[in-house]
Amino acid sequence: MAPLKIMKTASLVSFIALAIAVTLYHLSHYGVFKTLAVTAGTSFYHFFVRLVVGIYIDKVKQNRADITRSWYRIRPWETAFYRRIGVKNWKDKMPTSFPEYYDLRKHTPLELAQVTCQSEIIHEVNVLISVGALLGAVPFGMFPAFFLSSLAAGCFDMIFVVMQRYNRSRLMPLVERQRRTAGKTGSGTVQGNKIGGTR
């Protein structure tokens, strides 16, 4: 099942579970149903808000990020770090919502680099969303449950942040090579974060 479909299904299932648990709690006032409602509600929050964030940023950015911005630049220490944790060995085993975005046969290195920037931002926002879930502990208590679920969700998103920055570190030499080639041959012009003649 595609990751996007999993997110939609998980959002729907957790919402239904939340509605059932809340109803049963109001009818019986059993504490177990309150616990189930909080669990289902937290799950719904993590899945649904991530789904909305991903769709929104995809619509707004449309894979046209400015790769020259400081936030997207790969720092000198990152290459050694990614090598040490073996990103190359496990990144292809992780799910991808839109694999067609990462096809070098269909897109230029610049376009792929822009995709990695957009994906990185989505997952970084998701990390903040995970932290936001801790606010649920204020009215409901159960801080350990909120903390552990937020920590797990945030760490999961950070894996994808690392992946996208690693991918971009591999793509940037290709982008620069294409930029130099375009400048020498006159087949394209460089304007902002786009290379003319590649679209």
Identify the meaning behind each predicted range.
Residues 27-32, 137-145:
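Transmembrane helix interruption/hinge and helix-loop junction motifs
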Residues 21-25, 49-52, 129-136, 140, ...:
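Residue-level signal for alpha-helical transmembrane segments in multi-pass membrane proteins
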Residues 55-112, 169, 177-197:
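Membrane-proximal soluble regions of multi-pass membrane proteins
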Residues 34-43, 133, 145-154:
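Hydrophobic core segments of alpha-helical transmembrane domains in multi-pass membrane proteins
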Residues 144, 148-152, 156-176:
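Membrane-interacting alpha-helical segments
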Residues 111-141:
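Transmembrane alpha-helical segments and their cytosolic interface motifs
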Residues 1-39, 162-175:
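Cytosolic-side membrane-entry/anchor segment at the start of a transmembrane helix
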